[in-house]
From Swiss-Prot:
The complex is composed of an ATP-binding protein (RbsA), two transmembrane proteins (RbsC) and a solute-binding protein (RbsB). This is Ribose import ATP-binding protein RbsA 3. Its main location: membrane. PROSITE patterns: ABC_TRANSPORTER_1, ABC_TRANSPORTER_2, RBSA.
C-alpha cells in the first residue's frame, strides 16, 4: 500500500538575512486532517518558516511542496490561492474598520465588481463570528479588547477556503472558555480533512490537541514524533537543548517576609469597570492577580498608575497619598506598569534598545540646554541590559530585532530606569517560550528580593501558583477573595474567578481601619 502524499511538505529549506541564518536545511511535513504542533524557543525559526509557507518571505534554498508538487509561494495572495492560511500571533487587523470588513478584506480584494453588498457581508461575518464569540461584527476593531481582537483574527482565517491553517500562539490572549471553543473548532476542521499547524509554548494544549510534534532549535530541525510517544519534559528538553530544572524560583522564605506595606489600595473604583477594590502589597512580595479576562484586572492596574481616571477610593505609597492623574506622575512617584500589549504600548519597536530604556526618564539624561547626554544614556542602557541578561547585538540595535523574551526584558529595563518602588505587570510572559519564561520569573524574584513590590496579573494559573506569594482573585470588578499558602490551588482560584464563594475582601479590609 502506497504511503499518502503530504498535503504540505518543506524540504531542506534555508533562509538567510545577510550573514544571519534564520533557518538551516529544515524539513517538515503535514498530513491531510492532521493537527501538527511546531515547537521551539523564540528565535528557533518557527515564525520564519510560517512566513515562508504564507508567502511573506521567500526561502534562500530548498523547496515547498503542496500535494507532492513543488510550488513558488511568492506572496500571501499566492498562498491563499493554494489554500494556505495563517492566523498571526501579533494582531494584524485594521482598527478603524469594522469586524466584518476585517474578516472579509481578503475576499473583497479579489472581487471584480466595484459594488459591495454590506448587508450580506455582515450577515455572513456574524455567522462565522458566532462560532467563536457573540461579538457584533458592526463594531470597530479598535474598540475591542485584545482577546476579542484575537478572536476576530481567528474568525478571519475561517472565512478563507483553506486546506492548511497555521495557528501561531492562538490562545495567548484567550480565556479558558474561549480556548475550549477554539479547540472544538480545530477538531471540527480536522474532521473535515483540513490540516492544522499549531504553534504553541503551552504543553497542555499540544498534548490534548495535536497528533505529531516537530521541534526546531536555533534555526534547525531537531525531531518529529507522535505526541503519544513523548512527554512534555521530552519536548521541553528538545526545545532548549538543556534541562530546565525549575521553572519557578523559590518563593519568599518566612525569614524574608515583612509586614511593611509598600502600596495600599482602599475602596478604589472608576464608576464602571471596577469598584470597592481593597488590597495591600508588602515590600519584596510578588502578589498575583487572577480572574477571567474582562473581570477588571487590567483596569484596576491602570487606575492605580494614572492611566485610567478613578472616582472613588485612594492609593497610598509608603503611607503617603498617591494622586497620579497621569502615568508620568505615577512613574515619577515610583509606581510603574508593564502593559499586556507589549508591542502596542510597552516598547517602541523601531527605536533602539538604549532609546527605549531612556524614554521614561529623559529629564535626568538632558543637560541645561536640553541636549541629550548620549554617554549617560548608553551607560544606563549597558548597566540595565547587563543586569537583566538581555541577549542582543548591541544597545543601538532596534528592539524589533530581539526575540519576544528579550523584548520583554527591555520593557522591564525601561521601567527600572526610574528606580521604581512598585511594578505592576500585566501578562508578563505572554507569547514567550519556556526558557525565556523561566528567566523572567527569576528576574522578577530577584527584583522582589531587592525590595521592590511586584503585582503580576496573569491568566496562566500555573504561573500564579508557581511564582506568586499570594493571589488576589477579581470577579466582576472587585476582589472576590485571596488565597495563599496551602489554599493556593487552581480550583480555589477558578471558583473565586467564576463568582463561587461570593465577594470577600476580609483580608484586605483588616488593614482598612
Amino acid at each position: 500500500m502506497m504511503a499518502s502524499v503530504p498535503v504540505l511538505e518543506i524540504r531542506n529549506v534555508s533562509k538567510h538575512f545577510g550573514a544571519v541564518k534564520a533557518l538551516t536545511e529544515v524539513s517538515f511535513s503535514l498530513e491531510k486532517g492532521e493537527v501538527h504542533a511546531l515547537c521551539g524557543e523564540n528565535g528557533a525559526g518557527k515564525s520564519t518558516l510560517m512566513n515562508i509557507i504564507a508567502g511573506v518571505l521567500q526561502p534562500t534554498e530548498g523547496d515547498v511542496l503542496v500535494d507532492g508538487a513543488p510550488v513558488k509561494v511568492t506572496s500571501p495572495a499566492v498562498a491563499q490561492s493554494l489554500g494556505l492560511g495563517l492566523v498571526h500571533q501579533e494582531i494584524a487587523l485594521c482598527p478603524d474598520a469594522t469586524v466584518a470588513e476585517n474578516m472579509f478584506m481578503a475576499a473583497t480584494n479579489r472581487r471584480r465588481s466595484p459594488f459591495m453588498n454590506y448587508g450580506r457581508l455582515e450577515r455572513d461575518a456574524q455567522v462565522v463570528m458566532n462560532r467563536l464569540a457573540p461579538i457584533d461584527v458592526r463594531r470597530k476593531v479598535g474598540d475591542l479588547s485584545i482577546s476579542s481582537q484575537q478572536l476576530v483574527e481567528i474568525a478571519k482565517a475561517l472565512t478563507l477556503d483553506c486546506r492548511v491553517l497555521i495557528f501561531d500562539e492562538p490562545t495567548a490572549a484567550l480565556t479558558e472558555s474561549e480556548t475550549q471553543v477554539l479547540f472544538a473548532i480545530i477538531r471540527d476542521l480536522k474532521a473535515q480533512g483540513i490540516s492544522i499547524i499549531y504553534i504553541s509554548h503551552r504543553m497542555a494544549e499540544i498534548f490534548s490537541l495535536c497528533d505529531r510534534v516537530t521541534v526546531f532549535r536555533d534555526g534547525r530541525y531537531v525531531s518529529m514524533e507522535k505526541v503519544a510517544d513523548v512527554t512534555p519534559d521530552d519536548v521541553v528538553r528538545r526545545m532548549v537543548g538543556r534541562e530546565i530544572t525549575q521553572l519557578y524560583p523559590e518563593k519568599q522564605a518566612p525569614a524574608e517576609r515583612t509586614d511593611e506595606i509598600i502600596l495600599s489600595v482602599r475602596n478604589l473604583g472608576d464608576g464602571s469597570r471596577f469598584t470597592d477594590v481593597n488590597f495591600d502589597l508588602r515590600k519584596g512580595e510578588i502578589l498575583g492577580v487572577g480572574g477571567l479576562i474582562g473581570s477588571g484586572r487590567t483596569e484596576i492596574a491602570e487606575g492605580i498608575c494614572g492611566l485610567r481616571p478613578v472616582i472613588d477610593g485612594k492609593v497610598q505609597l509608603h503611607g503617603q497619598r498617591l494622586r497620579a492623574r497621569s502615568y508620568a506622575q505615577a512613574a515619577q512617584a515610583g509606581v510603574v506598569y508593564l502593559s499586556e500589549d507589549r508591542k502596542g504600548s510597552g516598547i517602541f519597536l523601531d527605536l533602539s534598545i538604549a532609546q527605549n530604556i531612556a524614554v521614561l526618564d529623559l529629564k535626568s539624561l538632558t543637560g541645561p540646554l536640553g541636549l541629550l547626554n548620549s554617554k549617560a544614556e548608553a551607560d544606563r542602557a549597558h548597566n540595565l541590559v547587563r543586569r537583566l541578561g538581555v541577549r542582543m547585538g548591541g544597545i543601538d540595535m532596534p528592539v524589533s530585532s530581539l526575540s519576544g523574551g528579550n523584548q520583554q526584558k527591555v520593557a522591564i529595563a525601561k521601567q527600572l530606569a526610574v528606580d521604581p518602588k512598585v511594578i505592576l505587570m500585566d501578562e508578563p510572559t505572554r507569547g514567550i517560550d519556556v526558557g525565556a519564561k523561566s528567566e523572567i520569573h527569576r528576574l522578577l524574584r530577584d527584583l522582589a528580593r531587592s525590595g521592590i513590590g511586584i503585582v503580576v496579573i496573569s491568566s496562566e494559573l500555573p504561573e500564579l501558583l508557581g511564582l506568586c506569594d499570594r493571589v488576589l482573585v477579581i470577579h466582576e470588578g472587585t476582589v472576590a477573595g485571596e488565597v495563599e499558602g496551602e489554599a493556593m490551588t487552581e480550583e480555589a482560584i477558578m471558583r473565586l474567578a467564576s463568582g463561587i464563594g461570593g465577594h470577600n475582601n476580609s483580608k484586605a479590609s483588616e488593614h482598612a481601619a
